[in-house]
Amino acid sequence: MDKIKKYSKLMIDEILDANMYIDMACKARTSNEEIAEDFVEIAKQELHHKDILHKVLKEYVEDYEDKNGKSVEMETILDFVADINSDMEAPVIAKMKTFE
């Protein structure tokens, strides 16, 4: 469970960082489009880091279930973490789309 907590917190941190960078991009947009695009790219990288952490967490749960049997509780926790991430990520993605 400590790994689930650790990786969940790391994923939230990545989303918060992505939000910070996309906000910086929005502010820089009017004064320096090139810098704004750089901040958008950094925000995308932060979300990619979150995706990698989610993959690691999912593999951890799968390994746990291989050793201990299928666990509804573990799947519920994984789904809950994914739901939280999705809810937090949605406004970041919406802001990113304004740069497309």
Enumerate the predicted regions with their spans.
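Non-heme di-metal
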Residues: 1-100
